């Protein structure tokens, strides 16, 4: 499988998304009760619990292990903050499209799921300082060759997950209503479709794509 960054790489930064507060930078974030994958750090003396929503389909940031528990870089980072700050963490795995609505409704306190900081999101939620810089990259199906942005534009079908930064990148390349963009509900579905040749390529976060390629060579 071949991974290629296009010429005008879109840089995004992962951060925590927090419910917007008056007078601070704003943003929207969602999360609800865990359907699977709920877990928590050991309880501190204070007993304060921070409800953290994740879409555990973004290895190495967050994914589900064999026991359906959430694991990954974001989990380790949040647990380290909880230990230092003296609070407990309740992780909740939810579909991506439910994360920001749940945050806005107060069902969770934080969304931590490799969230890209955008101007639109800052209008409805607050963000932490960025803790990881991510590029959007093109994952190319077997037998396809992509050397530059013009090669990407020449592809017949390019996958992206609805609402992800890769979707926004695809819209910049092809147009928001272009039939070239094949949208998927989840990242695993898109990655599998690229692998099977159902689409010519897919656009997603560099760290996630690199992890997928490493484990599927």
Language-model segment annotations:
Residues 87-88, 105-113, 157, 195-208:
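Alpha-to-beta junction loops
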Residues 51-54, 150-166:
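Short loop->beta-strand "edge-of-pocket" segments that line small-molecule binding or catalytic clefts
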Residues 21-31:
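Bacterial lipoprotein signal-peptidase II cleavage site
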Residues 34-114:
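Extracytoplasmic small-molecule ligand-binding "clamshell" domains
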Residues 83, 88-152:
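Acidic, polar ligand-binding/catalytic clefts
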Residues 98, 115-123, 169-172, 200-217:
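A ligand-binding cleft/hinge motif common to bilobed small-molecule-binding domains
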Residues 62-64, 78-87, 166-185, 213-217:
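Ligand-binding cleft/hinge of the Venus flytrap
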Residues 30-36, 40-42, 140-157:
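Flexible hinge/capping segments at coil-to-helix
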């Amino acid at each position: 499988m071949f991974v290629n960054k296009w010429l005008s790489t879109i840089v995004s930064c992962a951060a925590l998304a927090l419910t917007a507060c008056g007078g601070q930078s704003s943003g929207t974030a969602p999360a609800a009760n865990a359907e699977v994958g709920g877990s928590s750090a050991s309880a501190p003396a204070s007993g304060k619990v921070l409800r953290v929503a994740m879409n555990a389909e973004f290895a190495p940031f967050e994914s589900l292990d064999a026991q359906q528990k959430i694991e990954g870089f974001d989990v380790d980072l949040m647990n380290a903050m909880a230990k230092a700050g003296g609070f407990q963490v309740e992780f909740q795995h939810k579909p991506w499209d439910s994360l920001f609505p749940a945050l806005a409704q107060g069902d969770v306190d934080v969304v931590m799921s490799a969230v890209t900081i955008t101007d639109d999101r800052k209008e409805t939620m607050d963000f932490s300082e960025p803790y990881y810089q991510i590029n959007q990259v093109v994952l190319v199906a077997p037998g396809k060759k992509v050397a530059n942005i013009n090669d990407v534009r020449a592809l017949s079908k390019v996958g992206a997950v609805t609402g992800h930064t890769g979707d926004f990148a695809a819209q910049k390349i092809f147009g928001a209503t272009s039939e070239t963009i094949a949208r998927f509900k989840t990242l695993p579905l898109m990655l599998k479709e690229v692998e099977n040749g159902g689409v010519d390529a897919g656009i997603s976060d560099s760290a996630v794509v690199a992890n997928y390629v490493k484990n599927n060579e």
